[in-house]
Amino acid sequence: MWLCALSLISLTACLSLGHPSLPPVVHTVHGKVLGKYVTLEGFSQPVAVFLGVPFAKPPLGSLRFAPPEPAEPWSFVKHTTSYPPLCYQNPEAALRLAELFTNQRKIIPHKFSEDCLYLNIYTPADLTQNSRLPVMVWIHGGGLVIDGASTYDGVPLAVHENVVVVVIQYRLGIWGFFSTEDEHSRGNWGHLDQVAALHWVQDNIANFGGNPGSVTIFGESAGGESVSVLVLSPLAKNLFHRAIAQSSVIFNPCLFGRAARPLAKKIAALAGCKTTTSAAMVHCLRQKTEDELLEVSLKMKFGTVDFLGDPRESYPFLPTVIDGVLLPKAPEEILAEKSFNTVPYMVGINKHEFGWIIPMFLDFPLSERKLDQKTAASILWQAYPILNISEKLIPAAIEKYLGGTEDPATMTDLFLDLIGDIMFGVPSVIVSRSHRDAGAPTYMYEYQYRPSFVSDDRPQELLGDHADELFSVWGAPFLKEGASEEEINLSKMVMKFWANFARNGNPNGEGLPHWPEYDQKEGYLQIGVPAQAAHRLKDKEVDFWTELRAKETAERSSHREHVEL
């Protein structure tokens, strides 16, 4: 007992000097964890960092394709000072993404495991005091098939804004989203992992200096889609209090809207399993090793589009599904009924979402920048698996976006805008309007800046490509070298906006450009240099696509009635 008291006295003394000599130890409901202190250049306040804290049992054996279960308790002091393994995924794609997106000075070497349900915590709190700082829980992107927690260092955001940052991992790909669309494997396992992590935060974050009554979930791309799903899910009620969806929401056709059962059969067949019944497929796939499932995953070529085969037979991603549990009914119904979590909500897109990085990842044949309408129509149809645009709609879409030019380079740019609108712009506005109409505070932004850290291969004129805002949100200029004063100030402003929103449900604050609420006037903020308010983001595009889809639905139901007669 006296040893514990002595340790506590010395820890208090060290912390008061700002240079702790003893590593931080914190109690969780499962056992004690030992972390490390990190200091950001220019700040005396150290950040206590805990890497690889388990929030659930390893999802192995019978827990593959099953909801996560709470972690087993431990009786020793668990060292949580090194990054956890990433969830199983394509290692080459993971490395490519980390190189492009990370705010770290150098890439953290990757290890992969099915045992991957861990989270990282960055807390600037004095752990000897009863601090109650706002908590920001990050859900990474990567198309629900790649990436992990080690891409994001939470120290700059934690120390600049005095918030507790938590970065979670969740099952990906086949492991995270395999669905037979019935009780044998409902799917959405990765989203259920996210819910489990939020339960862990509620139970434990107070001991890390965080306030469990002030939790903001935020995520980008598939992480933004995940945030959007959690906003709709009754399972996540009261687990968070604000939400930020960056560059994707539930209606992104890449990640939601396709039948999962044909994909399940294809996966099972590639694994050498019988596909006669759901039970047979699930039982067989549970017997496969991690490496055998990875081999199947690589054969499926997730994260790329097949521009040669039948697009209706191609599955570039494993989708979020309506499972009756996480999503009890269709998102459209949940939004119409206003039966979702009406927390303050920030939704945003980047100016050129489909500018360079996603076409490159998906192998779009656009490198020559020489496009004509016929080729554009062909590419749109081949991209059906990620866009869900039927052949009937393609001529109208091509005419609307490309009809005003004959120049191949301009046509290419407009074509990229078309796809960006389908995947990101239009769904984001639709979700924001639904949230606003339910009476919840809503804010929108469009990010319009080219970070200095992006690849030299990218066209110079491209401002606000997919994921560009990550460098500002995560304080990359304070970890990487070469940022200008302008870029440093932009990052400070963006971190302040995000943290203000986490604190108050409103991004505005002293010394910041005014960010209008997204009300009936549809004000939003253009984030760039300078940042300025504007109105009606993508409203004409939303009108066009809403009308076009409604016409198609009406024709389909009229045809169905005719057939029935």
Swiss-Prot record:
Residues 1-18 form the signal peptide. One of its GO terms (molecular function) is carboxylesterase activity. It is found in: Endoplasmic reticulum lumen; Cytoplasm; Lipid droplet. GO terms for cellular component: cytoplasm; endoplasmic reticulum lumen; lipid droplet. The active site is at S221 (acyl-ester intermediate), E353 (charge relay system), H466 (charge relay system). It comes from the Eukaryota. Glycans are attached at N388, N489. Its main location: endoplasmic reticulum. It catalyses: a carboxylic ester + H2O = an alcohol + a carboxylate + H(+); cholesteryl (9Z-octadecenoate) + H2O = cholesterol + (9Z)-octadecenoate + H(+); 2-(5Z,8Z,11Z,14Z-eicosatetraenoyl)-glycerol + H2O = glycerol + (5Z,8Z,11Z,14Z)-eicosatetraenoate + H(+); prostaglandin E2 1-glyceryl ester + H2O = prostaglandin E2 + glycerol + H(+). Detected in kidney, liver and lung. Keywords: Cytoplasm, Disulfide bond, Endoplasmic reticulum, Glycoprotein, Hydrolase, Lipid droplet, Lipid metabolism, Phosphoprotein, Serine esterase, Signal. Induction: Up-regulated in liver upon feeding a diet enriched in cholestyramine or cholate. It is an enzyme of class 3 (hydrolase). Its EC number is 3.1.1.1, 3.1.1.13. Belongs to the type-B carboxylesterase/lipase family. Homotrimer and homohexamer. Binds to beta-glucuronidase. Involved in the detoxification of xenobiotics and in the activation of ester and amide prodrugs. Hydrolyzes aromatic and aliphatic esters, but has no catalytic activity toward amides or a fatty acyl-CoA ester. Displays fatty acid ethyl ester synthase activity, catalyzing the ethyl esterification of oleic acid to ethyloleate. Converts monoacylglycerides to free fatty acids and glycerol. Hydrolyzes of 2-arachidonoylglycerol and prostaglandins. This is Liver carboxylesterase 1. It comes from Mus musculus.
